[in-house]
């Protein structure tokens, strides 16, 4: 589940990112 995050996190700050992938993960974490 976090496999893509390793490479994606390089150029995408997870907390401040608004891309679809991060938004989906943030929503899942809230639940």
Curated annotation (Swiss-Prot):
SUPFAM superfamilies: Cysteine-rich DNA binding domain, (DM domain). It comes from Danio rerio. This is Doublesex- and mab-3-related transcription factor 3b. GO terms for molecular function: metal ion binding; sequence-specific DNA binding. Residues 1-31 bind DNA. GO terms for biological process: regulation of DNA-templated transcription. May regulate transcription. Keywords: DNA-binding, Metal-binding, Nucleus, Transcription, Transcription regulation, Zinc. It is found in: Nucleus. The lineage of its organism: Eukaryota, Metazoa, Chordata, Craniata, Vertebrata. It comes from the Eukaryota. Belongs to the DMRT family. PROSITE patterns: DM_2.
């Amino acid at each position: 589940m976090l496999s893509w995050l390793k490479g994606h996190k390089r150029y995408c700050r997870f907390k401040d990112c608004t891309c679809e992938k991060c938004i989906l993960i943030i929503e899942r974490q809230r639940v």
